[in-house]
C-alpha cells in the first residue's frame, strides 16, 4: 500500500494535477472483450494467450458489473453470505468467472521507463496476464492493485487478459449490507515512471496551541532503479490557493540514493488558514526530485489542510472549538452503474449533503474511490473511513471471525 499520487514531468502539469494530460498516462477504461462462465470449469483455459481469437466474444463496459450488463443477477444480502459458509472454501459449481481481454499500445516515449498497470477495484479476486505471460493475482475489492509490467510489455501493441472470480476466500470478509455484484468496478490504467522516483509520501498536518500557525511533518520515500550513488535534490514547496500562489514553505534536501531512501521534513508554517467543514481552506504541497544538473525528473502535488482534532471533556473539538456531527452513511452506489460510480455522481451526492447541512459522511462499509476523499477535502466534509472488513455471516457461533 502507498499514498495516492501521480507523477508529472513538468511543474506546471503537477500543479494542474490532471493525469489525463500526462503523456505517461493511458486509460484502459471503456469497451473490453468479455466472456461469462457460470463456473471455473467452463471458462477457456487459453483465453490469456496473446494470439487467442476473441472475435466472437461480447463486449462489456469497464468499469462496470457483469450483472448489470446482461450476465447473471445481482444479489442483495445483509447478514448472510450468498453461499453456505465453510471458510475458507467457496462454491465451485456456481462461482461465476468473467474473462476480460483488451489491447493497448505502448508508445516509443515510454521506452526505458518503468510501466505499471493499475486496477482501482475488482470484485472479488482476479488473475492478470500480459501478452500471454502471468503477471499476478489480487483480491480485496475496495483497494487498488498495481502490477509492475515493465518486463512483460513491448513497444507497440500489447494485450492484457483478466480472469475475475465472483467469490473467493476474501468474500468472507466482504459481507457488507449491500448489493453483491461482480467485475472490474473501478478504473483501469497504465502509466510510466522514471527509474528514479518518489515512491511514497506521508504528510501529517496540525496546528499549534494558538490555532494560528500550522505544523507539517513529512516523510518522503524515494527509489532509485537507475544509476546508484548519484546526488539528487528533493524539494518541498507549500503554496496557498490564491491567484498569486503565495509561498509558505520552500526547502531542498540533497542526498544520494542507492536503492531507496527516506527523507523527513518538519516545519512550522506561520499564519495559516485552518481547515473545517465550513471553511475548507487548502494548500498545495508539491514534491519534486531533480538530478545533479538541476533537470526535473518528476513532480507530484497534493492538497493539504491544517486542522487539529481533539476530544476534551466529552466534546469533539476541531481547531479548539466544539462541533456537532451531522452525518450520514453512504454506499458507493448508482441506480444505473452500481458501484462503478462517476465523479459527477460523487459531486452530486456531496452537493446534496451540503445543501442539507450535513457535515460528515461514513464510508459504509469499505474504502471509497480515492477521488471521493479529495472531493470531501475540497467541499468540506468530515470523513469516517471504514476498512473493507465485515463478516456478518460468521458472527453468531464459535467459528465466527470475532473469535
Regions found by a protein language model. Name each.
Residues 128-130, 213-255, 263-265, 285:
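Beta-strand-rich binding/interaction modules
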Residues 185-202, 307-321:
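Low-complexity, Pro/Ser/Thr- and charge-rich linker/hinge segments at domain boundaries
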Residues 18-19, 33-37, 65-68, 73, ...:
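Accessory beta-strand-rich segments of carbohydrate-active enzymes
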Residues 166-172, 290-297:
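Short acidic/polar inter-strand loop motif in beta-rich domains
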Residues 110-114, 153-157, 229, 269-284:
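Short glycine/proline/serine/threonine-rich loop/turn segments at secondary-structure transition edges
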Residues 4-11:
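Short, small-residue-biased leader/transition segments that mark boundaries at the very start
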Residues 124-127, 142-150, 163, 169-173, ...:
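Active-site mouth of glycoside hydrolases
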